[in-house]
């Protein structure tokens, strides 16, 4: 889905714009996170390749946000070695080397900014208020039937994670129970012994779900 590729860019606007107020709609100088990102790009020389441009975006966003966004961009795949041909409004080459990734990581770390104190990768339009207030999770009850989970009366959950015995995520689901108090989601893979389910708050705190 081409629109899924836009999600990380919108999440940055949701958090830095809607949660932190860094948007032209709220700043008296009509600046903001994205306006400042665009201005930086406008006033600096273009990089030669798409891979360089993609990875430089990680540095620029961290610089403008005054936050270490390496974890966020790593989870979205920006800092993954790749060498492919992309057909999107025309055909082009996308190459990201490990050396370039290491360079960007070093430059971002050298900025000295703290990491966000939220699970930025899980913010959605529906959870903006959770990220503003950062309430703790209120546990409800949960049942499982095969690979389908039903969560009842859980509150302040940004997302649910299903992880395997190594801690690798095998399923992630939206945590909000709107408009009812019950949410149901189904994994694409079969449930296995050793799998665990966690409710994740806006701050990234995890609460184990028991059945």
Regions found by a protein language model. Name each.
Residues 49-210:
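Beta/coil-rich, acidic/histidine-enriched accessory regions frequently appended to metallopeptidases
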């Amino acid at each position: 889905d081409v629109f899924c590729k836009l999600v990380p860019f919108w999440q940055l606007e949701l958090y830095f714009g809607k949660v932190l107020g860094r948007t032209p709609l709220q700043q008296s100088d009509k600046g903001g996170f994205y306006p400042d990102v665009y201005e930086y790009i406008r006033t600096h020389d273009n990089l030669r390749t798409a891979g360089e441009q993609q990875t430089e975006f990680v540095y620029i966003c961290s610089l403008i946000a005054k936050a270490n966004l390496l974890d966020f961009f790593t989870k979205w795949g920006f800092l993954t070695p790749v060498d492919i041909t992309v057909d999107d409004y025309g055909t082009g080459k996308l190459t990201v080397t490990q050396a370039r990734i290491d360079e960007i990581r070093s430059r971002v770390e050298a900025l000295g900014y703290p990491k966000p104190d939220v699970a930025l990768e899980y913010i959605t339009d529906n959870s903006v208020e959770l990220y503003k207030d950062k309430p703790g999770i209120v546990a409800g009850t949960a049942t499982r039937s095969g690979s389908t989970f039903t969560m009842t009366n859980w509150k302040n959950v940004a997302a649910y994670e299903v992880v395997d015995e190594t801690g690798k995520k095998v399923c992630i689901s939206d945590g909000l129970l709107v408009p009812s108090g019950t949410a149901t989601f189904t994994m694409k893979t079969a449930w296995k012994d050793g799998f665990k389910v966690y409710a994740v708050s806006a701050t990234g705190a995890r609460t184990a779900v028991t059945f």
